[in-house]
């Protein structure tokens, strides 16, 4: 078996007589996905250096040298001057190498005192996730704003509302669009709630048992923008429920986007004819010249399955690990990094797609009463006249049966046909057998009446603005 050679690039090796095999190293190396943590490694290392100094483990001069070296290393990481070498096992080893290159082994070699990769990576990963999900939250507000803008632009447009994908009741298009905004806002609520659990620092937990060097985990937590330090060092180094919760929140967001995408896919078909896609947000066919395909929506629908897979894979990784840290936990980062990357692609694309949709409101209005969508209004009119709903439901269903047999709408039934079904169906019932009247009558909170939808849009806009402000504020560090 080929040997890797030495333990150069690893943060261990004194107990070993030689380096790992090539296959072992290839399995172990992680810089191809954990390099995203490099900027956070610099921040955490600076905070760690300060507590080493407070514990009299670094002199004033060594601290100044180390902080200057870390600042330079951070700049070199940011501009691409410094990166991992093939011999680096992980981001932590690469960053220590970079620091030693800049300040020498005497000073650079002191930084590792009192910390383990176990508490280090758990902290850095939390820091990265906190920033990443804020970016996702901000992108989600932009999609919400696009839905709200289309709702405002088509405030009075009426469309068929559906249940079981069958004609149900007429609703405002704005009501339907805002119905997609609501779960997206809840997704941001979940991100913000998730941050409460992300904002606990594992730093200072060491490998699992804490540190004997009298360091100050609370000081590091505060400097790195955490709300508190962890209460239990074993849990802090080995728990990844914050990662699985993140995977769920991101998967749920993708699922909510997928539901919107599914409607867009249906609405742009000739059979529906509700919308026309912008050329900028659609594609064509290599063989069929007439095609304009909703690829953005289809990729959103497809990638939602990918994010669900990331969640289930991570849960399977975590399900049977004993305490404390196990190398299995190296598998925590790729699914989260991938889910974030996919959403960073999908959110601006879906926002662009939604904001450029052209709605065929005449077509929607034409189809709104199809399928006897005013049958409930007929029944509820009878209820307002004092008829028990059970009887009103039966009468309305009988009217539908007659209209269906004649191939006409409910409003086309004659007065004689209506009264023949039930004498209490007087000509006044025609007042509710219009889609405008039906929509306007549903004026309870959350309903489809124009005044209520306007209230909903105002609340959506206010929530989106507040979420965007939170996301832009970032983590205080």
From Swiss-Prot:
Q: Which PROSITE patterns match?
A: FUMARATE_LYASES (PS00163)
Catalyzed chemical reaction(s):
2-(N(omega)-L-arginino)succinate = fumarate + L-arginine
Query: Which domain of life does the protein's organism represent?
Result: Bacteria
Q: Which keywords label this protein?
A: Amino-acid biosynthesis, Arginine biosynthesis, Cytoplasm, Lyase
Can you supply a Gene Ontology BP term from the record? arginine biosynthetic process via ornithine
GO MF annotation: an example: argininosuccinate lyase activity
Give the pathway.
Amino-acid biosynthesis; L-arginine biosynthesis; L-arginine from L-ornithine and carbamoyl phosphate: step 3/3
**In the UniProt record, which is one GO cellular component term?**
cytosol
Tell me the Pfam families matching this sequence: ASL_C2, Lyase_1
The record ties this protein, via InterPro entries, to: Arg_succ_lyase_C, Argininosuccinate_lyase, Fumarase/histidase_N, Fumarate_lyase_CS, Fumarate_lyase_fam, Fumarate_lyase_N, L-Aspartase-like
Q: Indicate where this protein is primarily found.
A: cytoplasm
Where found, per UniProt?
A: Cytoplasm
EC number in record? 4.3.2.1
Q: Which family does it belong to?
A: Belongs to the lyase 1 family. Argininosuccinate lyase subfamily.
What is the protein name stated in its UniProt record?
A: Argininosuccinate lyase
Organism taxonomic ancestry: Bacteria, Bacillati, Actinomycetota, Actinomycetes, Mycobacteriales
